[in-house]
Amino acid sequence: MIDVPRTLAPAAGVATRYSLVPPRGGNPLWSTAVALAPVAGADGAEVPLSALVAGANGHSRADALLRGAGEAVERRALHPDDRLGTVRGTAAGLGRPALAAHDPRNALAHPDSARAELDWYPATRLSDAATVLVPAPLVDWPATAPGSLFDPGPSGAASGGSAGMALRSALVEIVERDAFTTAWGRRLRLPCWTDPFAAAAGTPDRPTGEALRALWRRAADAGVRTVFARIPTAVDGLCCVVACLLEPERPGALVTVGMKASDRPHDALLGALQEAWQVRAALEATLLDGPVADVPDPLVTEHDRIRYMLTARARRAVRDWAGGFVPAPAPMTAAEVTTDGIVTALLADGADPHVVDLTPRLPATVAAMGWRAVKVVPAGYQHLRMDETHEWSWNRSRLASAPERTGCPARLTDHRAAAPHPLP
C-alpha cells in the first residue's frame, strides 16, 4: 500500500529530505519540495535542477503531498542506471528492432543520431506489443548523450500506484504536450471561457468545485485575468485545458500558462489553473534574486525558460495567443475514457507510443509499496521542446495538420515565427 511519508523518508532511497509549505504570500497553493537522492556518477553542478529536486503544488495539504511524492518517484526513476537491460551500439549494428528517433515523422533526434553509438533500452510498442529498442537519451533525465543529438526532458514519464495508473498518466501527458506545442506553434484560435463554471457541464464534486472557485476568485481579487481554453485532441472525451493567468501590463507583471487533460472537465480546469499558479510562484521565487537580465536567446535549458517568462517578449506572446481565442460554443462534458480507448485513439491519429518500464530502477522498499513508473516515448507525436536551438525537433506533419485535426484556425503558417513556448 502506498505510504507517502515512508516514500519520502530518506531510508526509502527516493529522497534525502522534503518540505511542505502552506499557502503564503501571493501563492494560494500548498507546496511540496523534495530533494532527490543524488544521480549516481554525475557531477551535481551539471545536473538540471529538475533532476535534483521534485516539486508539486496542490489545493490542499494532502493533494500537494501526494503530488510531490508521485513526482519524486517519477524523477528518481528517470535517473540513469544499468537496470533496464541496456544495449550499446549503433542502430544498424544492434541486430534488433530499434526506433528511428531521427525520422522526421518522429522528430525526436538529430539525423546524426542514426549513426551514433548510443545506449538503448527495451520498450514495448503499444501498436503490437513488440519489443523495440529506444535510445536511452529519450528516457533518462538527466541524459548522458550529447545534447546536440537529442532534446531530453522528463515529459512523458509518470508514476502511480499500479502499472496501469502510471501508463495512463504518461499517455495523457504526451497528448497534452503534443496538443499544446502544436497549438502554440501555429497560434491556434482555441475555444475559450473566462468563467470555469461555464466551461464544464454539470456540478463538480465538492472539493474540486471549492478549490477551483477559490483559485479563480483569488486571481480576480488580485486583479489577474483568467482565461481557460480547450485544445481539441484525437481522444474523444479527454478535455485538454489551458489556463492563462494574465496580470495587467506593467513593469514586472507576471503572465503564466498551465495545462491539464482529464476526462473529468472540472478536474482539467482545476489542474490547469493550479499549474498556472505553480508557474507563477516559480517566477516570483526567481525574482527574489533580483531583476532578470541577459536571458539567453535561443533558450536551451528549463532555467532559461523560467527567466524568459519574466520578459516583456514572453508576456506579449502569451497575451497575443490568448487574445486570439474565441468564445466556446458549448461547455465541456464528462465522458469516461479508458486507457485502451486512449491507445486506440492515439494509434488512429498517427502516434506510435513506446513504453519503457522504469520500475526496476525504484528502490525495493518503494516498489514493494506498489509504486510503478514508466516513460512513454511519443513517436509520431510532437514532444515538448526544451532546447530552442534544435530545428529538427519540430514535428512538421503534426504542425501542418493541426488546424484540420482540431478544427481551430491557425494564425501562424510558419512555426518558426512563434516565440518560445511558456511551459518551463
Model-derived features with residue positions:
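Helix-biased "structured C-terminal domain" signature
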Residues: 1-424
